[in-house]
Amino acid sequence: MQQRRPIRRALLSVSDKAGIVEFAQALSHRGVELLSTGGTARLLADAGLAVTEVSDYTGFPEMMDGRVKTLHPKVHGGILGRRDQDDAIMAQHDIKPIDIVVVNLYPFAQTVARENCTLEDAVENIDIGGPTMVRSAAKNHKDVAIVVKSSDYSAIINEIDANEGSLTYETRFDLAIKAFEHTAAYDSMIANYFGALVPPYHGETDKPSGNFPRTLNLNYIKKQDMRYGENSHQQAAFYIEENIHEASVATSTQLQGKALSYNNIADTDAALECVKEFAEPACVIVKHANPSGVAIGGSILDAYERAYKTDPTSAFGGIIAFNRELDEETAQAIISRQFVEVIIAPSASEAALKVTAAKQNVRVLTSGNWQQRVPGLDFKRVNGGLLIQDRDLGMVDASQLRVVTERQPSEQELRDALFCWKVAKFVKSNAIVYARDNMTIGIGAGQMSRVYSAKIAGIKAGDEGLEVKGSAMASDAFFPFRDGIDAAAAVGITCVIQPGGSIRDDEVIAAANEHGIAMIFTDMRHFRH
């Protein structure tokens, strides 16, 4: 359907004023009459544009500190009026048709994100007139265009020029969908905010309010369709948050390679989130969502070489993440040595990209830099429901550790313990990590019993000829029995870091003392399922 509608009159009322003057100038230069409200009208007038205040157009002043501006029949009649049906009644009441509505809403999300936000602040930033105009224009998209995103301004002007002052139905329909998505997201934010202030269970006032809203509304934007999901018979797509405050796989830019698969994205996320844990130059290699090798070094090349040594077999077809710019030397080392699915780093040098270009199927992503880890929510889908928890940003430093054995760890053992503790947080439970000199030497992941994860970590180290004697071992959760300590001692582990908290802690500590192992309690668990 190519039905065009000429753009002769525009109503502009925006909270985010980025680009609005330029857009209004472009409309005005094309003969479009401008209506506006409040601060937007003043901004346009100050820019030298001929603009009519809505209050002058309606003959009704803005009132109640701006709460009532556009809620008037001459405004909504002009937006909702059907051009082929309501012309007579519009003329009878001197209602002029409004062809394009440009609105974005009060900054509710930014307001409630402030530390000192009060309930009154939140209430005053609930937009009423804005969403009403947006929904009115979107409903009447057959005749009216609604614009809620400044990123659409230039494309709209281009289409007006290409279509002799008109917009097509297809464009108006697409803009209407964006508008409904916009108001849905806005109302969801408001519902989530106020829902967290009342008892969470409908009608059950005796239950504690908790930290989560009683109704959860989520809004995500589709970034891409996938060829298939985790398996080829499953359909899939990748959705991202609208406002992302931390560099992540969702913010990443793909510089080369085939389209990312569902599994690529999941594994890249696992690798990137792990490498963010380190301040020093670090490399993480991931396979099937588990780290197969992690190391820090004097450079990312050094870190990569050491991470690769942990498990060269599993590194084949893996995901490699760095926390520094990908440089030429490191790119060359990877490309000449192994098959890799994805390389992700904060940035990549031009020289590095020339190297990776020789392997066009290799996906190279840049995430941008991250300053800090941002609190958020993690979700796990279960049949018929959704589990929600705070993102696991728990960390410990040396001052928070408790040595519970007769022997104190050496400085080297303590460094190794803290290193492998960071890694264990990103290994599927039951997780055991062996490490020495800032390098993993064996990882046991995802076993149903902790002792078998410990045995597997030792087997992996032995298979690669890596010396375990004198190494540290991290466990993501407590040891329910002493057998895990016995298995570690058998291969030469001399320091263990774990949360503690088992009813058999005394037996586990006694086993460590028998073997001369230093044991550290963190009092923090890092299950990962």
Swiss-Prot record:
Task: Name the catalysed reactions.
Answer: (6R)-10-formyltetrahydrofolate + 5-amino-1-(5-phospho-beta-D-ribosyl)imidazole-4-carboxamide = 5-formamido-1-(5-phospho-D-ribosyl)imidazole-4-carboxamide + (6S)-5,6,7,8-tetrahydrofolate; IMP + H2O = 5-formamido-1-(5-phospho-D-ribosyl)imidazole-4-carboxamide
Q: Name one GO biological process term.
A: 'de novo' IMP biosynthetic process
Identify the EC number(s).
2.1.2.3, 3.5.4.10
Keyword Methyltransferase tagged = no
Question: Which Pfam families does the protein's record reference?
Answer: AICARFT_IMPCHas, MGS
Under the heading SUPFAM superfamilies, the entry gives: Cytidine deaminase-like, Methylglyoxal synthase-like
InterPro entries from the xrefs?
AICAR_Tfase_dup_dom_sf, Cytidine_deaminase-like, MGS-like_dom, MGS-like_dom_sf, PurH-like
Q: Which GO terms describe its molecular function?
A: IMP cyclohydrolase activity; phosphoribosylaminoimidazolecarboxamide formyltransferase activity
Q: Which family is it part of? A: Belongs to the PurH family.
Q: What is known of its domains?
A: The IMP cyclohydrolase activity resides in the N-terminal region.
Family annotation (HAMAP family): PurH
Q: What is this protein called?
A: Bifunctional purine biosynthesis protein PurH
- Which organism is this entry from? Pectobacterium carotovorum subsp. carotovorum (strain PC1)
